[in-house]
């Protein structure tokens, strides 16, 4: 469009010059040379404009790729805590047990004893198990005779009906209670420890100076791997919170130093 405008404009100038200069025309070569220069200038202008647009487009693409890469890194950090389960056969579950802590058990039978290396004094189980561990109980009673007491009283038990939990991202997920693996489905059990009561003694935790401190027994949680699903899909191993201990929480009384 601009080239056509240049040609028309030059033709107009040539007509004016022919009238004003006693009908003398410009040399044909100089006119052609001027037209060629104008055309080249217009082509160069369009080329530079296109190059600028290409640079802007490439810059926008680079910025978008960087932003997408950052988002992917964030998603991968979250997904790194999630191990999907493709098949629910027994062999795969046996391989995936490395994701479990001792507090998580996959079994076709209800567990009757605490996990290995866990104390039995606070285990809430059957009388048969308690009779089997009478020697350990006598040892615990012997400790109490020496004046050793727990600040808080706790109890531990296998939770057999856990249906939901909070994962490491703060999302609520569904805990798989029963997993079908061929002819023998297995269930998922959680060994949890919690406080028996908030105040084992009148003023709070046992053995705390109540003149200067407020105290209360509180159940503490930690993360374990468990088979879960989110929104009825994405079945896999996730970190979830369960009750694992009982601690004494202290706060200084106002006006006390």
From Swiss-Prot:
Q: Which UniProt keywords apply?
A: Cleavage on pair of basic residues, Disulfide bond, Glycoprotein, Growth factor, Secreted, Signal
Where found in the cell?
Answer: Secreted
Q: What is the residue range of the signal peptide feature?
A: 1-18
Q: Which GO terms describe its cellular component?
A: extracellular region
A molecular function (GO) held by this record is: neurotrophin receptor binding
Q: Which domain of life is it from?
A: Eukaryota
Q: Which Pfam families match?
A: NGF, NTF3_N
- Name the major location: secreted
Glycosylation site positions = 131
Q: In which tissues is it expressed?
A: In the embryo, the expression peak at E4.5 and decreases at later stages of development.
Q: Which residues lie in the propeptide?
A: 19-138
Disulfide cysteine pairs (residue numbers): 152-217, 195-246, 205-248
**Family, per the entry?**
Belongs to the NGF-beta family.
Its function, per the record, reads: Seems to promote the survival of visceral and proprioceptive sensory neurons.
Q: What is this protein called?
A: Neurotrophin-3
UniProt organism field: Gallus gallus (Chicken)
Gene it is expressed from: NTF3
